[in-house]
Amino acid sequence: MVKVKFKYKGEEKEVDTSKIKKVWRVGKMVSFTYDDNGKTGRGAVSEKDAPKELLDMLARAEREKK
């Protein structure tokens, strides 16, 4: 799968899209939660920097919400 690179609390992080649980939009940012070895991690990336797979997950989540 594809890795998503993002900054969280000033720290550079990277997570595999297969570990992402939930995706939603906040303005022009794409926020998500992911499985961080049993804990829930959080992250956000701008829409323009988000990989296509993450945008596809966002589109699917928005469709299911309606």
Swiss-Prot record:
Superkingdom of origin organism: Archaea
Primary location recorded for the protein, binned into one broad class: cytoplasm
Localization terms from the record: Cytoplasm
SUPFAM superfamilies (alphabetical): Chromo domain-like
InterPro entries according to UniProt: Chromo-like_dom_sf (IPR016197), DNA-bd_7a-e_arc (IPR003212)
One GO MF term attached to the UniProt entry: RNA endonuclease activity
Modified-residue entries (N6-methyllysine), positions: 5, 7
PTM: Lys-5 was 70% monomethylated in form 7a, 25% in form 7b, and 20% in form 7d. Lys-7 was 50% monomethylated in form 7a, 40% in form 7b, and 50% in form 7d.
Keywords linked to the UniProt accession: Cytoplasm, DNA-binding, Methylation
Subunit note: Monomer.
Protein task: Can constrain negative DNA supercoils. May be involved in maintaining the integrity of the genome at high temperature.
Protein name according to UniProt: DNA-binding protein 7d
Record organism: Sulfolobus acidocaldarius (strain ATCC 33909 / DSM 639 / JCM 8929 / NBRC 15157 / NCIMB 11770)
